[in-house]
Amino acid sequence: QLALQAELYSVFNSMTDGDNHKFSKGISDAFKNFVDSGKPQTTDSGSIPTGTFTGASTDGSMTSDSSGCESIIQTACEAMVDGSKSNDYIAEKIAEGLQDLTDGTEVNTSVSGTTVPPVPPPPTIPTSGSAKGGIDCDTSPVEAGLKACFSAMVDMTEGGNMYFASELARLTYTCLTSGTVNTDGVGNLEGSKGVGNAS
């Protein structure tokens, strides 16, 4: 969370008025870096070709694509240029961009456990394998939190960039760690399903 806050703060401090591209790219890149640093943990079980498997993830990775997020925020920034859109609008679009990014995030895990084989047992009984899936996140609290953040910033004469960075980092951290990871076993663990979260 602190690394995300620092990256966002650096983006906001380096901006000049009207620098929409730096804003959209900076936020989307920061989101991507944070999500990609996440560690998924799952509990896995299910009927696989060689029996009934029960286990858990031992390692994992998350990989996201920030291009859709960047495009959503960039388009929103351009729409705000004429002053017809409020701060609530950009709050909605930042949350929408984060939703797009998390929806497209790929989760891969290494899984180990035990398999109860049928009778007679097959020649090979797997105790490990891999799984692939994604993460389901709810970004509505991010939208609500940013609307409150922007409202509070209206009367600020200093410290706005740090406040914005800290709030967006906090909201993003809570969003990701509250999400649900779902995976499906592949190969020798096909049929097993994993459920968990990310840290």
Map each language-model feature to its residues.
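Extracellular "spike/adhesin" assembly and maturation modules
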Residues: 1-199
